[in-house]
């Protein structure tokens, strides 16, 4: 089947998807949703030692409440001097809305005695800092299930664009609906966070599915001015091109043919498409980060000018949702449907009578769900045959879990322990993004072109492990070890560099260990491992906080998650891994 030529307008439509969605992760998930959920949890909390007594904190005012003054950030009869500059007032208000204590910026260095606050969550009492962590863990679990279940529908058949738009609009609406969530409806806030994060993950995977098709439509690495019509296949018994049925879960965006790799011309063609796909993907990532940067700037201004209250956080999330929704328009107008090939006959539900009813009820949807799960299972079985791939994936599972959980833990620690304002936390998030771009560009240069990729991974993981290790120092020293807000700014730059570098070097190393011609299915497992690991970290951190009521203890867990895989990575033999991959290249699927 011929591929329709990719036009410049269609490419802009794909870029619009990244431009629309990425601010959700950069701004909403990384900065404001954890703050809002923790603030609401504390406002509804009770004392840990007496559940009949609420924690001593008045609710944070926001427009719409009876008796709220014109400036919702400044309560009536405020004892703070009105001469405090506007750029410091955000910090002052954040301290005032702290649920455990009321003190001015002059008392910031003092550590007042704080009661331990807990909130009821599914029938049990948990620490208020655990509430956003459990929420995030549940959201990632749902995201993994949704992504695997819908992968077949987006990769095969006519649903690719429909699913991209559906999940994009669903994510935008659920993010914008945060503006209506008041403190007493904190459970709804948790629900919106779970649904919006799952929608983001599904939309991202749908977007990745377009990469190989768009790259295949650029014959000489350039777009076509006029779209060409696909020709009718002369032999319907032939399998569809690999560029059209690359598994949706592939995070690599690389298109490879399924034929023998011995043909030199075919290899050149494959490498060309890989380069084109990488170029498109890189531009999309850059535009996504730029959009996140712009929305973060807007949100910081909004948060400061509205008083750094929970109302400010909700407005910031509304901006993210509106941004995401508006830029679905160019996606709708410019991106082609790009239908994929039909499901393989062996997955037809008619071969399994007991599923025929389910497939009929879901209008054929059940076939696509089962196809996604079966594809993942086949890939997992193949990976088990390769020792070095298995070692890498286990190490990647732990590292990805640890480095991802650092972000949410740091935000909650900064808000709860260091009393940093939402605006300051947003600045911290921007530093992570900027530094992450630098890390992605510079990490491949570590040790020169002849450096072992395993050594590069060990170096970057060690850099990441320094973040929780530094937090642990706070148990033993009074002036260092995340005792001051400025320390978090420094660690944000350090962490961002490690985060950007880790994703780059791990992806490239994994690509060296897998069989040629099976890159897409193996990268699907790489992607699912990445997403699935993020369920465990927040869950364990939440359990630690519930037990100790001290978020700093979580740094021990994060340190273990990051240093343990170093031993696994050092056990990988790249030469042995390449030989295993070459052997599997000769094995028919």
UniProtKB/Swiss-Prot annotation:
This is Autophagy-related protein 22. Signal peptide: none annotated. SUPFAM superfamilies: MFS general substrate transporter. It holds the Pfam family ATG22. Its main location: membrane. It is a multi-pass membrane protein. GO terms for cellular component: fungal-type vacuole membrane. InterPro entries: Atg22, Atg22-like, ATG22/LtaA_families, MFS_trans_sf.
């Amino acid at each position: 089947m011929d591929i329709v030529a990719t036009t410049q307008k269609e490419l802009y439509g794909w870029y619009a998807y990244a431009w629309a969605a990425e601010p959700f992760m950069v701004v909403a998930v990384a900065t404001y949703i954890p703050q809002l959920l923790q603030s609401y949890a504390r406002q509804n909390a009770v004392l840990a030692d007496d559940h009949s007594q609420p924690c001593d904190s008045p609710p944070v005012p926001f427009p719409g409440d009876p008796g709220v003054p014109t400036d919702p950030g400044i309560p009536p009869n405020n004892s703070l001097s009105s001469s405090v500059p506007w750029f410091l007032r955000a910090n002052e208000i954040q301290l005032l809305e702290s649920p455990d204590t009321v003190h001015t910026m002059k008392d910031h260095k003092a550590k007042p005695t704080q009661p331990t606050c807990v909130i009821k969550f599914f029938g049990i009492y948990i620490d208020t800092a655990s509430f956003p962590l459990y929420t995030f863990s549940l959201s990632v679990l749902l995201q993994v299930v949704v992504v695997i279940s819908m992968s077949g529908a987006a990769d095969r058949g006519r649903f690719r664009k429909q699913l991209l738009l559906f999940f994009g609009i669903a994510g935008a609406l659920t993010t914008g609906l945060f503006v209506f969530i008041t403190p007493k409806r904190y459970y709804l806030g948790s629900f919106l966070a779970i649904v919006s994060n799952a929608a983001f993950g599904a939309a991202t995977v749908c977007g990745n599915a377009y990469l190989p098709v768009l790259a295949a439509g650029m014959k000489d690495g350039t777009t076509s001015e006029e779209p060409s019509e696909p020709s009718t296949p002369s032999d319907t018994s032939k399998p569809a091109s690999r560029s059209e049925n690359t598994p949706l879960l592939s995070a690599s965006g690389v298109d490879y043919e399924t034929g023998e790799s011995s043909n030199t011309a075919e290899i050149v063609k494959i490498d060309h498409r890989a380069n084109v796909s990488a170029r498109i993907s890189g531009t999309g990532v850059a535009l996504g980060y730029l959009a996140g940067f712009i929305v973060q700037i807007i949100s910081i201004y909004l948060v400061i000018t509205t008083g750094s209250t929970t109302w400010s956080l909700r407005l910031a999330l509304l901006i993210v949702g509106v941004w995401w929704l508006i830029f679905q328009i160019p996606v709708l107008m410019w991106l082609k449907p790009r239908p994929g090939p039909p499901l393989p006959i062996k997955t037809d539900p008619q071969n399994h009578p007991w599923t025929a009813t389910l497939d009929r009820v879901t209008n054929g949807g059940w076939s696509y769900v089962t196809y996604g799960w079966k594809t993942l299972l086949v890939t997992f079985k193949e990976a088990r045959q390769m020792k070095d791939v298995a070692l890498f994936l286990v190490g990647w599972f732990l590292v990805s879990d640890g480095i991802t959980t650092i972000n949410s833990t740091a935000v909650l620690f900064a808000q709860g322990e260091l009393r940093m304002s939402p605006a300051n936390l947003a600045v911290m998030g921007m530093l992570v993004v900027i530094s992450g771009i630098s890390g992605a560009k510079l990490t491949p240069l570590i040790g020169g072109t002849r450096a072992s990729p395993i050594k590069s991974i060990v170096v970057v993981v060690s850099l990441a492990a320094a973040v929780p290790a530094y937090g642990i120092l706070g148990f033993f020293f009074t002036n260092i070890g995340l005792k001051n807000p400025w320390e978090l700014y420094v660690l944000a730059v350090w962490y961002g560099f490690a985060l950007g570098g880790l994703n780059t070097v791990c992806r490239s190393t994994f690509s060296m260990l897998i069989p040629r011609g099976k890159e897409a299915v193996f990268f699907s497992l790489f992607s699912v491992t990445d997403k699935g690991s993020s369920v465990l970290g927040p869950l364990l951190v939440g359990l630690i906080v519930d037990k100790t009521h001290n978020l700093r203890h979580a740094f021990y867990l994060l340190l273990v998650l990051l240093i343990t895989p170093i031993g696994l990575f050092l056990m990988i033999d790249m030469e042995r891994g390449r030989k295993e991959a070459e052997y599997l290249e000769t094995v028919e699927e």
